[in-house]
């Protein structure tokens, strides 16, 4: 049984940590790596319960962040996509001296809609959790389709995301269930003012999971951060617009 998270490292330059989202694994960054490794020493991980970290579990966002901090560079820019953005944000709060810059991609401090807060309807997350017990592979595929919905290149986006999922061991069903619970329950909004590192928030205007209007709400909660919205992207702008995505990242890390 594996007892340590699966990390991979490539490239040279300042350290950059990449954290994937729910249902995925570190292979999701594959097409981005040739654009990043000439400029950064890139570290990407299979999160607890995913890919080659299949046998490792973490029950809370704090535990996930700490597991990553335990084996990550002494200081680095952390980039987290979707659920990975929640983990990166938690790491930035736990260890600001280690997470020197924060980049959140198609992410939110509170994924579930609540009152006037925009997000995923709780019923949708409940349905996904119920479906997991029946056919978790189909549930992951439905989530992939949701992530690409709205993108002009949706079919190609889904193909690339699916290739990443299938290239490594399937996710642990328990980790998938825990991840959906975290997406439904975690709320970091009250702590965002404590983030003092440079922070870039990236969104897709066509995102059906994290509505682009959340960007404006976040301007109020985290005025110390900056943000960019990719006009023709959905939930995975680094898949649909890799060159534009990397250029935005390079401009921020300068």
UniProtKB/Swiss-Prot annotation:
What this protein catalyses is: 6-carboxyhexanoyl-[ACP] methyl ester + H2O = 6-carboxyhexanoyl-[ACP] + methanol + H(+)
State if Cytoplasm is listed as a keyword.
Answer: yes
Q: Pathway it acts in?
A: Cofactor biosynthesis; biotin biosynthesis
- One GO cellular component from the entry? cytoplasm
**What top-tier enzyme class does this entry carry?**
hydrolase
Q: Does the keyword Transmembrane apply?
A: no
Spell out the molecular function terms from Gene Ontology. Answer: pimelyl-[acyl-carrier protein] methyl ester esterase activity
Where does the protein principally reside?
Answer: cytoplasm
Top-rank taxon = Bacteria
Which residues participate directly in catalysis?
82, 207, 235
The record's keywords, sorted A to Z, are: Biotin biosynthesis, Cytoplasm, Hydrolase, Serine esterase
Q: Which residues of the sequence carry a binding annotation for substrate?
A: 22, 82-83, 143-147, 235
Q: Which GO terms describe its biological process?
A: biotin biosynthetic process
Name its cellular compartments. Cytoplasm
Q: What is its EC number?
A: 3.1.1.85
The AB hydrolase-1 domain covers: 16-242
| Annotated HAMAP family | Carboxylester (MF_01260)
Oligomeric and partner information? Monomer.
UniProt function note: The physiological role of BioH is to remove the methyl group introduced by BioC when the pimeloyl moiety is complete. It allows to synthesize pimeloyl-ACP via the fatty acid synthetic pathway through the hydrolysis of the ester bonds of pimeloyl-ACP esters.
Q: Which PANTHER family does its entry note?
A: HYDROLASE ALPHA/BETA FOLD FAMILY, PIMELOYL-[ACYL-CARRIER PROTEIN] METHYL ESTER ESTERASE
| Family that this chain belongs to | Belongs to the AB hydrolase superfamily. Carboxylesterase BioH family.
The protein in question is named Pimeloyl-[acyl-carrier protein] methyl ester esterase
Organism in which the protein naturally occurs? Photobacterium profundum (strain SS9)
């Amino acid at each position: 049984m594996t007892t340590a998270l699966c990390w991979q490292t490539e490239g040279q330059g300042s350290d950059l940590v990449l954290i994937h989202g729910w249902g995925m694994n570190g292979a999701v960054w594959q097409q981005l790596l040739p654009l990043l490794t000439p400029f950064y020493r890139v570290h990407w991980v299979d999160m607890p319960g995913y890919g080659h970290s299949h046998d490792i579990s973490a029950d809370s966002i704090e535990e996930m962040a700490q597991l990553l901090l335990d084996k990550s560079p002494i200081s680095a820019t952390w980039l987290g996509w979707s659920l990975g953005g929640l983990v990166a944000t938690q790491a930035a709060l736990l260890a600001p001296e280690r997470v020197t810059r924060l980049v959140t991609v198609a992410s939110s401090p509170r994924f579930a809609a609540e009152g006037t807060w925009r997000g995923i309807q709780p019923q949708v997350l409940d349905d996904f959790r119920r479906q997991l017990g029946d056919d978790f592979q189909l549930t992951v595929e439905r989530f992939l389709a949701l992530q690409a919905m709205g993108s002009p290149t949706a079919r190609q986006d889904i193909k690339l995301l699916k290739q990443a999922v299938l290239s490594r061991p399937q996710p642990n069903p328990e980790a998938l269930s825990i991840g959906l619970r975290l997406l439904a329950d975690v709320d970091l909004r009250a702590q965002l003012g404590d983030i003092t590192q440079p922070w870039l928030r990236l969104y897709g205007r066509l995102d059906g999971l994290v509505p682009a209007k959340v960007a404006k709400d976040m301007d109020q909660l985290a005025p110390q951060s900056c943000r960019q919205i990719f006009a023709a992207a959905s939930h995975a702008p680094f898949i649909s617009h890799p060159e534009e995505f990397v250029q935005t990242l390079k401009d921020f890390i300068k």
